A protein has these predicted regions:
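Juxtamembrane transmembrane-helix boundary motif
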Residues: 1-24, 44-45, 50-52, 70-164, ...
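Alpha-helical transmembrane segments of polytopic integral membrane proteins
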Residues: 39, 63-66, 100, 121, ...
Length: 269
């Protein structure tokens, strides 16, 4: 193995572990899989193909979400009502994840990147409003008889996004659980982790049956996933005592960079 090859391997390991640790801490704090945060590292720092990014992100999200949910459940950050809503969401999410996985490989790379940019823009807008403070959203409570059907339908929508883009979907699911179903932010994060697990598995299984699980994607998943799991443990441990505001600001800047980069690529086409 030549010197240049060893340098490339060292760079790959450092970027993968470092970015995985950073995104894992954020995921542990907020209750996410961390997929959106990993997109710029995988696409631009590691220069991975889009399909490898999607598959690697799904695998890492599953490992991170599994650790997050286990630690949060042990800390008592879950309720019976939340589990009931989560179960209904899972039903819809499984169907959505399958459909989204199929759609992702029928779209051109340009359209898929445009979809990612749009999704990240929505996440950034919500995050900026949170950081500004004093901005609150309330859509009222859902009649109890409609809770489960609504949860299943919204799970379907988030599942489509998860399967198509390779994300766990917590950024979209948590606001729904808080604003529509009235769950506390910490319980909502735990519930979202639970829904993420089977959703990710379905999406990953479908990508595999279509032949899009490659050695490159698995290599990224192992290296970055190791850092993400360690970060998730750290983030979950400090969840109670930290507001995560500084991390949110860094996250917002990272999302902005990704959106600008994707937009410039699309404009050059």
């Amino acid at each position: 193995m030549g010197l240049e090859s060893r340098r490339k391997d060292a760079r790959f390991v450092l970027i993968s572990l470092g970015s995985g640790l950073f995104t894992g801490v954020l995921a542990g704090l907020v209750g996410l899989g961390g997929a959106e945060e990993r997109i710029p590292f995988i696409l631009y720092a590691l220069r991975a193909p889009l399909n490898d990014m999607i598959v690697a992100n799904l695998i890492i999200s599953f490992a991170t979400s599994a650790v997050n949910f286990t630690l949060r459940a042990q800390a008592g950050l879950v309720t019976l009502d939340a589990l009931t809503i989560g179960a209904a969401m899972i039903v819809g999410s499984l169907v959505g994840a399958y459909a989204g996985s199929v759609a992702s490989h029928r779209l051109s790379e340009g359209r898929l990147k445009a979809a990612i940019a749009l999704i990240l823009s929505l996440v950034l807008a919500r995050l900026v409003l949170d950081l500004l403070g004093g901005v609150s959203f309330s859509f009222g409570s859902i009649p109890s008889v409609l809770e489960l059907p609504v949860a299943a339908f919204l799970g379907l929508l988030v599942g489509v996004v998860s399967g198509a883009v390779g994300v766990a979907g917590g950024e979209y699911r948590i606001p729904v659980l808080v604003f529509l179903f009235g769950l506390g932010i910490k319980v909502a994060g735990t519930t979202s982790q639970l829904v993420s697990l089977p959703t990710i598995l379905v999406a990953l299984w479908k990508h595999r049956t279509m032949g899009f699980v490659t050695s490159g994607g698995l290599r990224i998943a192992v290296a970055m996933g190791t850092g993400s799991v360690v970060g998730a443990v750290i983030g979950t441990v400090i969840l109670v005592s930290s507001s995560g505001r500084i991390v949110e600001i860094v996250f917002a800047l990272l999302l902005l960079y990704t959106i600008v980069r994707l937009t410039l690529e699309l404009l050059r086409r």
